[in-house]
Amino acid sequence: MNSKKLCCICVLFSLLAGCASESSIDEKKKKAQVTQSNINKNTPQQLTDKDLFGNETTLAVSEEDIQAALDGDEFRVPLNSPVILVQSGNRAPETIMQEEMRKYYTVSTFSGIPDRQKPLTCNKNKDKNENEDVASAENMNWMQALRFVAAKGHQKAIIVYQDMLQTGKYDSALKSTVWSDYKNDKLTDAISLRYLVRFTLVDVATGEWATWSPVNYEYKVLPPLPDKNEASTTDMTEQQIMQLKQKTYKAMVKDLVNRYQ
């Protein structure tokens, strides 16, 4: 084989290989990632603790840090203050929640679906300082960006709530109710409903935050009325869920106002 043919073969292999050579295992991983990505696209992304609190939940905390946090001033959100309201996993908070909040505050809304960063590619800028890139990635988080948006709009606070509707069924063996996430399942009168919510309140100026979960309500699903078709039964279920949410939102907002006005 002469040198020209050998050179052509080498060039061909390098083009096929791209920026990195991949084994059959790499191909399987890629396919799995694509499959997982397609699944995730169908499920709204929820805000995580890292989105809300940055790296605070994973940092090494000293006793001095705790005492300094205790000595910090408590922040307040006076009535009629301009605030940003966010519901995790939704483009906008539910209308009934917005209406309840507007009784006490001037409300603007923001999307609760985080924009995830694109994965790194092999086309890397070698001239860039890698340490600076790592530091920037560690310091940037969703809440920090939203605080900047709120500051530009002269908002006083950011209120984020994460919610979860669950169904429960009594287990005679365990002698307790077993709860699981509601997935549009058909409900019977043996099922209970509960609506779990966690609030995170962030002061725009200081970044100080507080988080808590109000006491939740539990509803027993009402049995369908006799001689009612499936559509009527579905409407009745939706009404019960809406009533549960409305009652929960009303109590939650009242609790928020009492704590921070």
From Swiss-Prot:
- Report the leader peptide range: 1-18
Asked whether the UniProt record includes Transcription among its keywords, one would answer no
The transmembrane segments are: none
In this UniProt entry, which residues carry a covalently attached lipid of the kind S-diacylglycerol cysteine? 19
Q: Which domain of life is it from?
A: Bacteria
Topology within the bilayer = Lipid-anchor
Instruction: Specify the protein name.
Output: Uncharacterized lipoprotein YafT
Naturally occurring in which organism (per UniProt): Escherichia coli (strain K12)
Q: What is the lineage of its organism?
A: Bacteria, Pseudomonadati, Pseudomonadota, Gammaproteobacteria, Enterobacterales
